[in-house]
Protein backbone atom coordinates (compact mmCIF):
# COMPACT_ATOMS: atom_id res chain seq x y z
CA UNK A 1 0.00 0.00 0.00
CA UNK A 2 1.34 3.41 -0.87
CA UNK A 3 2.24 5.72 1.98
CA UNK A 4 1.30 8.79 0.00
CA UNK A 5 -2.16 9.88 -1.03
CA UNK A 6 -3.98 7.63 -3.46
CA UNK A 7 -3.63 8.50 -7.12
CA UNK A 8 -6.81 9.75 -8.73
CA UNK A 9 -7.59 8.07 -12.06
CA UNK A 10 -7.55 10.36 -15.06
CA UNK A 11 -11.00 11.18 -16.39
CA UNK A 12 -11.80 9.51 -19.69
CA UNK A 13 -12.47 11.89 -22.59
CA UNK A 14 -15.81 11.35 -24.31
CA UNK A 15 -15.65 10.04 -27.86
CA UNK A 16 -16.02 12.67 -30.61
CA UNK A 17 -18.92 11.09 -32.54
CA UNK A 18 -21.43 10.16 -29.84
CA UNK A 19 -20.07 12.24 -26.96
CA UNK A 20 -20.17 9.21 -24.65
CA UNK A 21 -17.53 8.11 -22.16
CA UNK A 22 -18.80 4.54 -22.37
CA UNK A 23 -18.19 4.42 -26.13
CA UNK A 24 -14.68 5.80 -25.54
CA UNK A 25 -14.07 3.07 -22.97
CA UNK A 26 -15.22 0.38 -25.42
CA UNK A 27 -12.99 1.87 -28.15
CA UNK A 28 -9.98 1.77 -25.82
CA UNK A 29 -10.75 -1.85 -24.92
CA UNK A 30 -11.13 -2.90 -28.56
CA UNK A 31 -7.88 -1.12 -29.53
CA UNK A 32 -4.87 -3.36 -30.09
CA UNK A 33 -1.28 -2.23 -30.70
CA UNK A 34 -2.26 1.42 -30.36
CA UNK A 35 -4.41 1.44 -33.51
CA UNK A 36 -7.17 3.69 -32.25
CA UNK A 37 -8.50 4.64 -35.69
CA UNK A 38 -9.25 1.03 -36.61
CA UNK A 39 -10.77 0.44 -33.15
CA UNK A 40 -13.05 3.45 -33.72
CA UNK A 41 -14.10 2.05 -37.11
CA UNK A 42 -14.97 -1.28 -35.49
CA UNK A 43 -16.95 0.21 -32.60
CA UNK A 44 -18.79 2.78 -34.72
CA UNK A 45 -19.61 0.11 -37.32
CA UNK A 46 -20.91 -2.21 -34.61
CA UNK A 47 -22.99 0.61 -33.08
CA UNK A 48 -24.49 1.42 -36.50
CA UNK A 49 -25.48 -2.23 -36.95
CA UNK A 50 -26.99 -2.37 -33.45
CA UNK A 51 -28.90 0.84 -34.12
CA UNK A 52 -30.30 -0.46 -37.40
CA UNK A 53 -31.29 -3.82 -35.83
CA UNK A 54 -33.07 -2.32 -32.83
CA UNK A 55 -34.32 0.97 -34.25
CA UNK A 56 -33.18 2.73 -31.07
CA UNK A 57 -30.24 5.09 -30.47
CA UNK A 58 -27.10 2.89 -30.51
CA UNK A 59 -25.48 4.49 -27.44
CA UNK A 60 -28.64 3.86 -25.44
CA UNK A 61 -28.60 0.20 -26.54
CA UNK A 62 -24.91 -0.12 -25.60
CA UNK A 63 -25.57 1.38 -22.16
CA UNK A 64 -28.43 -1.06 -21.62
CA UNK A 65 -26.25 -4.01 -22.71
CA UNK A 66 -23.43 -2.94 -20.38
CA UNK A 67 -25.93 -2.54 -17.54
CA UNK A 68 -27.19 -6.07 -18.23
CA UNK A 69 -23.71 -7.62 -17.89
CA UNK A 70 -22.52 -5.44 -14.98
CA UNK A 71 -21.71 -7.63 -11.95
CA UNK A 72 -23.12 -6.83 -8.50
CA UNK A 73 -21.12 -9.33 -6.43
CA UNK A 74 -17.83 -11.12 -6.96
CA UNK A 75 -15.63 -13.38 -4.86
CA UNK A 76 -12.21 -12.52 -3.51
CA UNK A 77 -9.79 -15.00 -2.00
CA UNK A 78 -9.14 -14.55 1.71
CA UNK A 79 -6.67 -16.63 3.69
CA UNK A 80 -7.85 -17.50 7.18
CA UNK A 81 -5.94 -19.96 9.34
CA UNK A 82 -4.25 -21.83 6.52
CA UNK A 83 -7.40 -22.13 4.42
CA UNK A 84 -8.37 -20.03 1.43
CA UNK A 85 -11.98 -18.90 1.37
CA UNK A 86 -13.81 -17.34 -1.55
CA UNK A 87 -15.45 -14.37 0.17
CA UNK A 88 -18.31 -12.62 -1.66
CA UNK A 89 -17.89 -8.83 -1.84
CA UNK A 90 -19.81 -6.06 -3.57
CA UNK A 91 -18.15 -4.77 -6.73
CA UNK A 92 -17.32 -1.03 -6.72
CA UNK A 93 -19.13 0.87 -9.47
CA UNK A 94 -16.00 1.73 -11.47
CA UNK A 95 -14.69 -1.84 -11.41
CA UNK A 96 -18.13 -3.24 -12.25
CA UNK A 97 -18.38 -1.11 -15.38
CA UNK A 98 -14.80 -1.94 -16.37
CA UNK A 99 -15.49 -5.66 -15.96
CA UNK A 100 -18.68 -5.39 -18.01
CA UNK A 101 -16.90 -3.67 -20.92
CA UNK A 102 -13.98 -6.12 -20.69
CA UNK A 103 -16.30 -9.13 -20.78
CA UNK A 104 -18.28 -7.73 -23.72
CA UNK A 105 -15.15 -7.14 -25.81
CA UNK A 106 -13.39 -10.37 -24.79
CA UNK A 107 -16.38 -12.57 -25.56
CA UNK A 108 -16.95 -10.67 -28.81
CA UNK A 109 -13.37 -11.51 -29.82
CA UNK A 110 -13.93 -15.17 -28.97
CA UNK A 111 -17.01 -15.49 -31.20
CA UNK A 112 -16.76 -17.51 -34.40
CA UNK A 113 -18.28 -15.01 -36.79
CA UNK A 114 -16.30 -13.16 -39.43
CA UNK A 115 -15.15 -9.64 -38.74
CA UNK A 116 -14.95 -7.83 -35.43
CA UNK A 117 -17.84 -5.50 -36.33
CA UNK A 118 -20.21 -8.49 -36.61
CA UNK A 119 -18.79 -10.09 -33.48
CA UNK A 120 -19.13 -6.97 -31.34
CA UNK A 121 -22.60 -6.03 -32.59
CA UNK A 122 -23.90 -9.58 -32.05
CA UNK A 123 -22.38 -9.76 -28.56
CA UNK A 124 -24.04 -6.44 -27.65
CA UNK A 125 -27.37 -7.73 -29.00
CA UNK A 126 -26.97 -10.99 -27.05
CA UNK A 127 -26.17 -9.06 -23.87
CA UNK A 128 -29.27 -6.95 -24.44
CA UNK A 129 -31.35 -10.15 -24.67
CA UNK A 130 -29.62 -11.66 -21.60
CA UNK A 131 -27.70 -14.22 -23.63
CA UNK A 132 -24.13 -14.62 -24.85
CA UNK A 133 -20.79 -15.16 -23.18
CA UNK A 134 -20.61 -11.88 -21.27
CA UNK A 135 -24.01 -12.41 -19.63
CA UNK A 136 -23.08 -16.01 -18.82
CA UNK A 137 -19.87 -14.79 -17.14
CA UNK A 138 -21.85 -12.30 -15.03
CA UNK A 139 -24.26 -15.08 -14.05
CA UNK A 140 -21.38 -17.44 -13.15
CA UNK A 141 -19.70 -14.79 -10.98
CA UNK A 142 -23.00 -14.09 -9.20
CA UNK A 143 -23.66 -17.81 -8.66
CA UNK A 144 -20.18 -18.25 -7.20
CA UNK A 145 -20.83 -15.38 -4.78
CA UNK A 146 -24.19 -16.88 -3.77
CA UNK A 147 -22.64 -20.31 -3.24
CA UNK A 148 -20.02 -18.82 -0.90
CA UNK A 149 -22.45 -16.64 1.03
CA UNK A 150 -21.55 -18.58 4.19
CA UNK A 151 -18.11 -16.91 4.18
CA UNK A 152 -19.48 -13.37 3.91
CA UNK A 153 -18.56 -12.67 7.54
CA UNK A 154 -14.86 -12.81 6.53
CA UNK A 155 -15.39 -9.59 4.57
CA UNK A 156 -12.78 -6.91 5.23
Task: Write out the residue ranges for each language-model feature.
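Strongly charged
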Residues: 1-33, 37-40, 44-156
Amino acid sequence: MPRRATIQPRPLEADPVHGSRLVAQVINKVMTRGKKASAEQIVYGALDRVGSKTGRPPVEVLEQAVKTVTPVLEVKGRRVGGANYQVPVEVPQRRARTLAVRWLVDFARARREKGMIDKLSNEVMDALNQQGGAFKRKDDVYRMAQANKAFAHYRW
